Amino acid sequence: KTNLPKLRSHVGMVFQHFELFPHLTITENLTIAQEKVLGRSKDEARDKGLKLLDRVGLKAHAHKHPAQMSGGQQQRVAIARALAMDPICMLFDEPTSALDPEMINEVLDVMVELAQEGMTMMCVTHEMGFAKTVAHRVIFMDHGLIVEDATKDDFFGKPRSDRAQQFLAKILHH
């Protein structure tokens, strides 16, 4: 039988709204769960947090509060915060939908790096170029139902359903 609480503790989640604590600095946002949930010391949590901020290109912003950062920067902090918990996989729910178009690539670049490093990820997205680059499998849904479940090559190259064909014709040709 699967121990769900234990499994959940190994799953990182990043949502379309970053949900950073506005009254805490970026460093504090990255360390609080490490200390409270994982029992890491302040120094250990801070070191891990700063290393992850460096990884997402934001180490120079460690002292700032979320309101002092762009949406793309805040979303990269949210990714670093999830990674600080040492997840075995990551769930992303429309991580770029709340961002200005110019900020989207900042976040997608970090996610592409994670995929290239072998992180298992499940991502709800409308970013088809991103999905085409990093996905192994695509599940296409419409009105809450699975319309197509295919490899990325099959989905993008020869979608089986009329609905997926219509969607891709509109999305990939603009």
PLM ranges: what are they?
Residues K1-K152:
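ABC family nucleotide-binding domain
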